[in-house]
Amino acid sequence: MTVSPTDRMISSAYSATIRGRQDIDIYPQVGGMLTKVSVTEGQRVKSGQTLFIIDQVPYEAALQTAVANVESAKASLATAQLTYDSKEELYKENVVSAFDLSTAKNSLLAAKAQLAQAKAQEVSARNNLSYTVVKSPADGVVGTLPYRVGALVSSSIPEPLTTVSGNSDMY
């Protein structure tokens, strides 16, 4: 037997996971039934691209109610302003008491506060409606999609709707 030098390649196999530097778990900010899944597993997405749509009907109704409440509060404020102005003139002519004037002023202040509250509720309703469209926060690749159309989701679901992995920088 002769021994001679030869070139050999030694290979080793290791299990590993390649991940993007940034993995973003996607959770909904509002609850409801998934009405549309706009992506597939492994699809590349851009920042701001729609991933999911949650049932918008209850949120649209809440917005309409909030808008109506703002209009109602505006009307109440206008009435309270007229009442106060009227009482103020009558008070100057000693027709009504200081108590009546103070009551009208307090009603005016309450109407202003109700309008501010109604406007805040409208902003909240608009935000909630916008949250029904779940968008990608960054460029990347969509991970697994454990939820399908018809699934009931909320901000407290145990598993994210998906994960968007930024794969421009891997490790």
Language model segments and positions:
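Short coil/turn motifs at secondary-structure junctions
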Residues: 21-23
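Amphipathic alpha-helical coiled-coil/rod segments that serve as protein-protein coupling scaffolds
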Residues: 3, 7-13, 25-156, 169-171
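Active-site-adjacent helical/loop segments in soluble small-molecule enzymes
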Residues: 16
